[in-house]
Structure formats: structure tokens, C-alpha cells
Design a protein with these regions (language model features):
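Structural signature of tandem alpha-helical TPR/SEL1-like repeats
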Residues: 59-69, 93-106, 128-140, 162-171
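Alpha-helical segment of the N-proximal tetratricopeptide repeat
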Residues: 43-76, 82, 86, 93
């Protein structure tokens, strides 16, 4: 989505699920298309503006400020599904997935076609080690955006954490085809794939 750039940070932070060593650098994630979204709730301008400020802060890694602004947006409009989803993913990272998931669920109940919330839910479920649920939500993102590199990559990490070699390699290959060196660099340092490092197909 052109108005949402924070999916990238979710991918970057998800690297914290497992690095062999060093600090993960941010891959360049594509935006999730807004065209698929069916509007079901009109967000008031003041709440929308606060949400955009929150998303910008989150995209810069300023999560405390992003949460403060997201809460302000929600105070202005309790059904601002964009702010609810953003709050949910922040809480999922900073407190626990169980704290964040209900806010993302509420966002999806208000706007079921909001693809960013599907992505946020996929990441939150992965953080909670609910790998099958995470795969379901990444697949929803791919249904709306078949070229979404980091959803293929997210599915690959889920299968890797489940020690499903064949599926992990299959989805990782799809991610590499779309994302190239950014994906290769991420996979080379994240311990999701540690058990595959000596595998000829992984190399």
C-alpha cells in the first residue's frame, strides 16, 4: 500500500526471531496494494492523519512514538482499523503476540479486506510460534499481491521452523526469484535456515 510503509520494519524485526550473528539489515520490501481493499469504514481525517504519522514513526523504528500516535488515532476513532493493526503489531513485538493479536483481529473484523492487517497478523502469529496460522495469513497477502516477496519469505521461515525442508526451500526459492540478493542476505544470517546451511539446494 502506498500509504503504508511499515511492513518492512515488521520483516526486519522478525529477523530477531533468529540471527546467527551480526545485525540484520533491512531488506527492501514492496508495499502491499491498497487496490484490493474494500472500504467498509470511513476514517475521519484527524484520525487518518494521526495514523499516517504513527506509520511513519514506526517505519523509522520509533516504536514508542508510533504507539503513542496510534493510540491518539484510535482515541479519535475507535474503528480506525489501520491504527488498530499498527498498534497490534507494535504490541506483538514489544510486549507479546497475545497482547497484540486482539487489536489486529479487531482491525480485520472492521475491514476484512485490509491486506496490511493480514500481513501484520501473519507476523504476529509467527512471533507466537503459531506457524500454521502465520502461513494462512501470509497466503491471504499473496492472494491479494502475488509478487509480495516477504510473504513468500515469511512462509519459508515458518516451514523452516517446522523443519519442513522441501516446503521451506520451495518458498525460499520463490522469495529469492522476486527479491534477489536482499532475500539471500536475510536467509544467510537468520537461524530459521541454520539446519539447511549445508544443504546443496540451500546453497
Amino acid at each position: 500500500m502506498k500509504e503504508i510503509g511499515y511492513a518492512l520494519l515488521a520483516v526486519l524485526l522478525l529477523a530477531g526471531c533468529g540471527l546467527d550473528s551480526g545485525e540484520e539489515k533491512a531488506p527492501a520490501a514492496e508495499d502491499i496494494p491498497a487496490a484490493q481493499e474494500i472500504k467498509v469504514h470511513e476514517i475521519p481525517a484527524i484520525s487518518e492523519t494521526l495514523y499516517h504519522k504513527a506509520a511513519q514513526a514506526y517505519g523509522k523504528g520509533h516504536r514508542t512514538e508510533a504507539l503513542r500516535l496510534a493510540n491518539q488515532a484510535i482515541n479519535e476513532d475507535g474503528e480506525n482499523y489501520k491504527a488498530l493493526s499498527l498498534k497490534g503489531i507494535i504490541l506483538a513485538f514489544d510486549i507479546s503476540p497475545d497482547e497484540g493479536i486482539p487489536f489486529i483481529e479487531k482491525a480485520l473484523s472492521i475491514s476484512p479486506s485490509y491486506v496490511q492487517a493480514d500481513y501484520d497478523m501473519a507476523v504476529a502469529q509467527k512471533l507466537g510460534r503459531h506457524y500454521d496460522e502465520s502461513i494462512v495469513y501470509f497466503q491471504k497477502v499473496l492472494k491479494a499481491d502475488p509478487q509480495n516477496t516477504w510473504s513468500y519469505y515469511g512462509i519459508a521461515t515458518n516451514f523452516a521452523d517446522k523443519r519442513d525442508r522441501e516446503e521451506a526451500l520451495d518458498y525460499l526459492e520463490k522469495a529469492v526469484i522476486l527479491g534477489g540478493q536482499d532475500v539471500v542476505s536475510a536467509a544467510s544470517v537468520q537461524d530459521h535456515f541454520a539446519f539447511l546451511r549445508e544443504d546443496a539446494e540451500f546453497k
